[in-house]
C-alpha cells in the first residue's frame, strides 16, 4: 500500500542551470481505479531531461510503483542560479502546456526560503 503523501517531497530540482520542469498532481491509487480525493502537487525539474515527458515518465513510474496515481498539470523551464540565490520559473511545455507557475513558485519558495523566486508566462 502507498505511504503517506506527506512523505513525497514537494520540490526536487537540479541545483544550477536552466532546465525543463513539470508540475505533477499526485494522489493515492484507489482499488476502484478512481482517483482519491487527497492529493498534492509536486515540482520536478532536471537538466538531464531533453523533453518534459522524460521527467514525467520517470517520476510517475516511480510513484505508481509505490501505489500513487499521477497527472501532469503542465511544464515550463527553471533558471536556477544557486550562487546568486535566484530561481526564475517561466515558459511552457509543447506536450503538456503551461504549468501554473504561481503554484510551482510557491512550492519552490517554501523549499528555498532564502532565495529570490520569480515567475513569468513569457518565453519557451
Swiss-Prot record:
Enzyme type, top EC level: hydrolase
Annotated GO biological process: actin cytoskeleton organization; lamellipodium organization; negative regulation of T cell receptor signaling pathway; positive regulation of cell motility
Keyword Glycosyltransferase: no
Coiled-coil regions listed: none
SUPFAM superfamilies: PHP14-like
Keyword Transcription regulation: no
Gene3D superfamilies documented for this protein: Janus/Ocnus
Active site: 52
Subunit field text: Monomer.
Assigned protein family: Belongs to the janus family.
Name by which UniProt lists this protein: 14 kDa phosphohistidine phosphatase
Species this chain originates from: Mus musculus
Gene that encodes it: Phpt1
Amino acid at each position: 500500500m502507498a505511504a503517506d503523501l506527506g512523505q513525497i517531497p514537494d520540490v526536487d530540482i537540479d541545483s544550477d542551470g536552466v532546465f525543463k520542469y513539470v508540475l505533477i498532481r499526485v494522489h493515492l491509487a484507489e482499488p476502484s481505479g478512481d482517483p482519491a480525493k487527497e492529493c498534492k502537487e509536486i515540482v520536478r525539474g532536471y537538466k538531464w531531461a531533453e523533453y518534459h515527458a522524460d521527467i514525467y515518465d520517470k517520476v510517475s513510474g516511480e510513484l505508481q510503483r509505490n501505489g500513487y496515481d499521477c497527472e501532469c498539470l503542465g511544464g515550463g523551464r527553471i533558471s536556477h542560479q544557486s550562487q546568486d540565490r535566484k530561481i526564475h520559473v517561466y515558459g511552457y511545455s509543447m506536450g503538456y502546456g503551461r504549468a501554473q507557475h504561481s503554484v510551482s513558485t510557491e512550492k519552490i519558495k517554501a523549499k528555498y526560503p532564502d532565495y529570490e523566486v520569480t515567475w513569468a508566462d513569457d518565453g519557451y
